[in-house]
């Protein structure tokens, strides 16, 4: 059985989701959530929280593969820089836990899930609920991470759209 962790990095909220694929390539949602940090904390403390919490998630679920959403350059350079810090911590956690990272552009993820590279958050949540039955997910960060994991399954040929 293949287990994939999908990640949507962010300094305030890092979304994560774990899926498994059985021998028939059916997707099962194993867990997901958001690692949140307090904006009142210093950057170093926030990054440490992301790192430690992500290591716990990886240890708990033992995924075989990892998929991370690439960052885009924002109009606000400071926001782009702090997003890059969060992404760096995610990459480090994956490296330390010996998971190979696969990266996907946000537009590619959206297109593979919804058919539209410019889909909004509600469309993504709607489609992941169509793909993964009996899913109760409300947070868009976790839904984005789930979309990244599903995109990876589709892209790597582990699974195909029916």
Swiss-Prot record:
Subcellular location per UniProt equals:
Cytoplasm
Manner of cofactor binding, per the entry note? Binds 2 Mg(2+) ion per subunit.
Please give the cofactor(s) recorded in the UniProt entry for this protein: Mg(2+)
Look up the record and give one Gene Ontology term from the biological process aspect.
DNA recombination
Q: Does the keyword Hydrolase apply?
A: yes
Q: Which residues bind Mg(2+) 1?
A: 8, 141
Reactions catalysed, as given in the entry: Endonucleolytic cleavage at a junction such as a reciprocal single-stranded crossover between two homologous DNA duplexes (Holliday junction)
- Which E.C. number(s) belong to this protein? 3.1.21.10
Which residues are recorded as binding Mg(2+) 2?
A: 69
Q: Spell out where the chain crosses the membrane.
A: none
Q: Where is the active site?
A: 8, 69, 141
Q: Which GO molecular function annotations are given, in alphabetical order?
A: crossover junction DNA endonuclease activity; DNA binding; magnesium ion binding
Query: What function does the entry list?
Result: The RuvA-RuvB-RuvC complex processes Holliday junction (HJ) DNA during genetic recombination and DNA repair. Endonuclease that resolves HJ intermediates. Cleaves cruciform DNA by making single-stranded nicks across the HJ at symmetrical positions within the homologous arms, yielding a 5'-phosphate and a 3'-hydroxyl group; requires a central core of homology in the junction. The consensus cleavage sequence is 5'-(A/T)TT(C/G)-3'. Cleavage occurs on the 3'-side of the TT dinucleotide at the point of strand exchange.
Regarding protein family, the annotation reads: Belongs to the RuvC family.
Checking HAMAP family in the record gives: RuvC
Partners and quaternary state? Homodimer which binds Holliday junction (HJ) DNA. The HJ becomes 2-fold symmetrical on binding to RuvC with unstacked arms; it has a different conformation from HJ DNA in complex with RuvA. In the full resolvosome a probable DNA-RuvA(4)-RuvB(12)-RuvC(2) complex forms which resolves the HJ.
Q: State the name under which the record lists this protein.
A: Crossover junction endodeoxyribonuclease RuvC
Q: Upper lineage ranks?
A: Bacteria, Pseudomonadati, Pseudomonadota, Alphaproteobacteria, Rickettsiales
